[in-house]
A protein has these predicted regions:
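Phosphate/nucleotide-binding beta-alpha loop and adjacent structural elements of enzyme active sites
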Residues: 1-185
Length: 186
């Protein structure tokens, strides 16, 4: 697990900045986006992250050796919990910078498979609306973006980037990896 202020945390931050400059459209992967991901890393992998409580909750559903799907993996704190419990994890995250963070944190774990995709009712390709200053609220829903525009609580949120993303279905994931004992979706 990555702890804020640690050498591993600083290394991941540097790698994310390098990835943002070299791999994706700089407008989508701007400095505010990096700050949003770094903030999430601090919250969910930092010294005050609720690891014990999370493990206690998921232990009710996940046994050692279980197959777990993490749909919308964000920065991978649930992946970390599932792995601490001994599960094999298939993690899906469509947001490019969050996926890069996941890859740096969990990419070498042979019991974690990371997919830079989204899950939907139909397979295909869709446009991901990226909020570059708050990348955790990126969405496939243009309707959501339109309704959030100017809505109370969403005044400062702008979806100013777009990325084509492959869509897979739960049925497709099950056909490829098997039936999971637990699916976390958000």
């Amino acid at each position: 697990s990555v702890v804020a202020g640690s050498a591993a945390f600083r290394k991941i931050s540097r790698l994310l900045q390098k990835s943002a400059r070299s791999k994706w459209d700089i407008d989508v992967m701007s400095s505010p986006a990096l700050q949003g991901v770094i903030r999430s890393l601090r919250i969910y992998h930092g010294p005050h992250a609720p690891r014990d409580a999370m493990d206690q909750l998921y232990r009710l559903f996940v046994e050692p050796g279980a197959l777990v799907f993490d749909i919308g993996a964000h920065v991978g704190d649930r992946i970390s919990s599932f792995r601490r419990l001994g599960a094999r994890v298939i993690a899906v995250e469509p947001q490019p910078l969050l996926f890069s963070a996941l890859n740096h944190i969990h990419g070498r774990d042979p019991l974690v498979e990371l997919l830079d995709r989204a899950v939907g009712s139909d397979a295909g390709v869709r446009e991901l609306f990226v909020n570059t200053t708050n990348p955790t609220v990126s969405t496939l829903s243009e309707e959501f973006v339109n309704q959030a525009r100017g809505a109370r609580g969403w005044e400062d949120q702008i979806w100013d980037g777009r990325v084509p993303i492959e869509i897979v279905t739960l049925d497709g994931l099950i056909a490829r990896y098997g039936t999971p004992s637990f699916i976390k979706i958000d």
